[in-house]
């Protein structure tokens, strides 16, 4: 029993020390609550904001709306089969494979 008494005393001393440390913070908090009583009452903001959050906003801005609208159009329209079956990347083009450039109608000012 004598071993428990010093531990209890040390626990009480620690509690007193914590109270001394936190008491200035609690005093400052009490001052602020007295000065601004309406701040801590309503978590979640104004009634307008709460109503908007409950309603659930579907689109952030007009860009989101237009993208969703375009997705809906893409789902409704039947996709046309591609008439070109050309596969790209079969070979590396060489200068002989490329078509010739057409001469420009306007004379270049750099060639002058």
Swiss-Prot record:
Pfam families xref list: Endosulfine (PF04667)
Compositionally biased spans, kind Basic and acidic residues: 12-32
Principal location class: cytoplasm
Assigned GO CC terms: cytoplasm; nucleoplasm
GO BP: cell division; G2/M transition of mitotic cell cycle; mitotic cell cycle; positive regulation of D-glucose import; positive regulation of gluconeogenesis
Residues bearing the modification N-acetylserine: 2
Entry PTM: Phosphorylation at Ser-62 by MASTL/GWL during mitosis is essential for interaction with PPP2R2D (PR55-delta) and subsequent inactivation of PP2A. Phosphorylated by PKA.
Covalent S-S links between cysteines: none
Composition-biased stretches (Low complexity): 1-11
Induction: Expression may be regulated by miR-451.
Record's signal peptide: none
Domain of life: Eukaryota
Keyword rRNA-binding: no
Keyword terms, alphabetized: Acetylation, Cell cycle, Cell division, Cytoplasm, Mitosis, Phosphoprotein, Protein phosphatase inhibitor
Any GO molecular function: protein phosphatase regulator activity
Modified residues (Phosphoserine): 2, 23, 62, 104
Annotated compartments: Cytoplasm
InterPro entries: Endosulphine
Chain residue ranges for the region called Disordered: 1-49, 73-112
Positions where N6-acetyllysine occurs in the chain: 109
Function text: Protein phosphatase inhibitor that specifically inhibits protein phosphatase 2A (PP2A) during mitosis. Inhibition of PP2A is enhanced when ARPP19 is phosphorylated. When phosphorylated at Ser-62 during mitosis, specifically interacts with PPP2R2D (PR55-delta) and inhibits its activity, leading to inactivation of PP2A, an essential condition to keep cyclin-B1-CDK1 activity high during M phase. May indirectly enhance GAP-43 expression.
Matches recorded under PANTHER family: CAMP-REGULATED PHOSPHOPROTEIN 19, ENDOSULFINE
The family this protein is said to belong to: Belongs to the endosulfine family.
Subunit structure: Interacts (when phosphorylated at Ser-62) with PPP2R2D. Interacts with SNCA. Interacts with PPP2R2A; the interaction is direct and this interaction inhibits PP2A activity.
Protein's name in the database: cAMP-regulated phosphoprotein 19
Annotated organism of origin: Homo sapiens
């Amino acid at each position: 029993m004598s071993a428990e008494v010093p531990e209890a005393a040390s626990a009480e001393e620690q509690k007193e020390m914590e109270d001394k440390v936190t008491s200035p913070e609690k005093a400052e908090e009490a001052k602020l609550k007295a000065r601004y009583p309406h701040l801590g009452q309503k978590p979640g903001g104004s009634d307008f904001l709460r109503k908007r959050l409950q309603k659930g906003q579907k689109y952030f801005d007009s860009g989101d709306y237009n993208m969703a609208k375009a997705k809906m159009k893409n789902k409704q329209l039947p996709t046309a089969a591609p008439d070109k079956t050309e596969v790209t990347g079969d070979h590396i083009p060489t200068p002989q494979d490329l078509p010739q450039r057409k001469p420009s109608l306007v004379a270049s000012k750099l060639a002058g």
